[in-house]
Curated annotation (Swiss-Prot):
One of its GO terms (cellular component) is plasma membrane. The keyword NAD applies. It catalyses: a quinone + NADH + 5 H(+)(in) = a quinol + NAD(+) + 4 H(+)(out). One of its GO terms (molecular function) is NADH dehydrogenase (ubiquinone) activity. This is NADH-quinone oxidoreductase subunit C. InterPro entries: NADH_DH_suC, NADH_quin_OxRdtase_su_C/D-like, NADH_UbQ_OxRdtase_30kDa_su, NADH_UbQ_OxRdtase_CS. It is found in: Cell inner membrane. It is an enzyme of class 7 (translocase). Its EC number is 7.1.1.-. PROSITE patterns: COMPLEX1_30K.
Length: 213
C-alpha cells in the first residue's frame, strides 16, 4: 500500500519531468534532494523559469517565499542563488538554483515576483551578488558606509570598521577596529584532550587527541 509520503514524492518526480520537458534549454537538470524537488537552471533563463513555474497549470508556484545566497569560495562560480517557491493550490514546494561569480550579473526577477525586490537587495548586501535591471539595488541590512559583504566566507569576523556614536561630535563615526583583547581562535575539535589517555580510549570521536587529525 502506497503511503501519502510516497505519493507526494512520486508527484514531485512527475512534476520535475514535466518541467524538464517544457524547458529543455533553460534547465540544466531536475533532481530530488532529500525528497524535495530541485531545479538547476541556466542563469540567463531564471526569469523565464520562474515565470513558467508561476503560470503553468501543473505548477502554479504563485509565491516566491525567499531568495537565499550561498558562498562556496573554492568554486569557479562561487555563489549559488536559491529561489524557494510555494504552490498553495497544489500544496507543493520547489527550489530553483543558479550559480554566479563576483563579476557575473544575475537577472532580476522583480518583474515576475515583486517580493524579490528586498530579497535581491539582501543578497547584494550580504554577498555582493549583483542583480541586473533591479529597480533599486541598495544595501538593506548594513549601513551606508559598510565595507565588504558580511556573509562571504572570506569576510573577517571583526569586520573592517567600527561604528559608534561619538558623544562629543554628536554623530556616528567610523573608526578602525580596536579589539579590547587580542583576537583568539578557540579549537573545539578535541574536548577530551585534557583527560587521561586510558579514559580517552573509551570515548569515541577524538581523532585529534590521538594524533590522527
Amino acid at each position: 500500500m502506497t503511503s501519502v509520503f510516497e505519493e507526494r514524492v512520486e508527484s514531485l518526480k512527475e512534476l520535475g519531468a514535466r518541467i524538464e520537458a517544457a524547458l529543455p534549454t533553460d534547465v540544466v537538470r531536475v533532481e530530488m534532494a532529500k525528497d524535495e524537488l530541485q531545479v538547476i537552471a541556466q542563469r540567463p533563463s531564471i526569469a523565464k523559469v520562474l515565470t513558467f513555474l508561476r503560470d503553468d497549470s501543473a505548477c502554479r508556484f504563485s509565491q516566491l517565499v525567499d531568495i537565499a545566497g550561498v558562498d562556496y569560495p573554492s568554486r569557479e562560480e562561487r555563489f549559488e542563488v536559491v529561489y524557494n517557491m510555494l504552490s498553495m493550490h497544489h500544496n507543493q514546494r520547489i527550489r530553483v538554483k543558479i550559480s554566479a561569480s563576483e563579476d557575473t550579473p544575475v537577472p532580476s526577477v522583480t518583474r515576475v515576483f515583486s517580493s524579490a525586490n528586498w530579497f535581491e537587495r539582501e543578497a547584494w548586501d550580504m554577498y555582493g551578488i549583483f542583480f541586473s535591471e533591479h529597480p533599486d539595488l541598495r544595501r538593506l541590512l548594513s549601513d551606508y558606509g559598510f565595507e565588504g559583504h558580511a556573509q562571504r566566507k572570506d569576510f573577517p569576523l571583526t569586520g573592517y570598521k567600527e561604528v559608534r556614536y561619538d558623544e562629543e561630535l554628536k554623530r556616528v563615526v567610523y573608526e578602525p577596529v580596536r579589539l579590547s583583547q587580542d583576537f583568539r581562535t578557540f579549537d573545539f575539535l578535541s574536548p577530551w584532550e585534557g583527560m587521561d589517555r586510558q579514559i580517552r580510549r573509551v570515548l569515541p570521536g577524538d581523532e585529534k587527541a590521538e594524533g590522527n587529525a
